A protein has these predicted regions:
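Signature of N-terminal electron-transfer/Fe-S-associated modules in redox systems
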Residues: 1-150
Length: 150
């Protein structure tokens, strides 16, 4: 364990990381220590995207989606992590959250946060949004999500 105080920003809120093993996954730390449960564990191998969060180490332009089930807490010290809870809320959802709702694109909803995180990350990247970049952002996902992201 560490006795030093380390900082991570979760959804733009400063969080001190103390007395936690830095080799715990970011996913487990979010869910078990902070009750941020929108980020899910599906496969624990980084293939399904249910655990996706956006990491921002330096600037918004530096942000990218990561699989929180594969990343250790110690690797993200000093970073800003955005989870599905940080994108919007019931009264003020992110436009992509609203689009998923309006298009009935969530199926059971378990992996929907990962789709939305990947989509928001693509939108924020400044890349041209077309079928290729959407497919890259959400590779392996189903047609309704693809149509919604377009």
């Amino acid at each position: 364990m560490t006795d030093s105080k380390n900082i991570i920003y979760i959804n733009n809120k400063k969080v001190e990381v103390t007395n936690v093993y830095h080799d715990i996954t970011l996913l487990d730390w979010l869910r078990n220590y902070h009750k941020i449960t929108g980020t899910k564990e599906g496969c624990a191998e980084g293939d399904c995207g249910a655990c996706s969060v956006i990491i921002n180490k330096k600037s918004k332009e530096d942000s990218k989606p990561i699989n929180s089930c594969l990343v250790r807490l110690g690797q993200v010290i000093g970073s800003n992590i955005t989870t599905i809870e940080g994108l919007g809320c019931d009264k003020n959802p992110h436009p992509l959250q609203m689009a998923f709702s309006n298009e009935y694109a969530s199926q059971c909803g378990y992996c929907t946060p990962g789709f939305i995180i990947s989509g928001v990350s693509l939108i924020n990247s400044g890349k041209v949004i077309n079928n290729d970049t959407i497919n890259d952002a959400i590779s392996g996902n189903y047609v309704d999500a693809l149509v919604t992201l377009q």
